[in-house]
């Protein structure tokens, strides 16, 4: 899972992820932004579910993050729409609406994001 952190013209951090993990980048860009307390909550949840049968999820404005002891899933909330609710001819590109990754890989990205943000 490759990633890149960039700063836009306003100084905001943007995350770009490798193909198949784009949704992880969208989650950082849309849900986290400058809200590092959300990362605190996610890291605490990861410690809670790691090595257990439990799972945790948090629905945001655009994306929902779900994790169990081994993996993290981030999905666009729009995936809750049924096919009947979509306009004719419209469909969602699932690669950019759902992403799965290992817990350790995800936590490495979180740590790298924190480090990048702290280098303002």
Swiss-Prot record:
Assigned protein family: Belongs to the UPF0231 family.
HAMAP family: UPF0231
Protein's UniProt name: UPF0231 protein YacL
Species annotation: Salmonella heidelberg (strain SL476)
Lineage, broadest ranks: Bacteria, Pseudomonadati, Pseudomonadota, Gammaproteobacteria, Enterobacterales
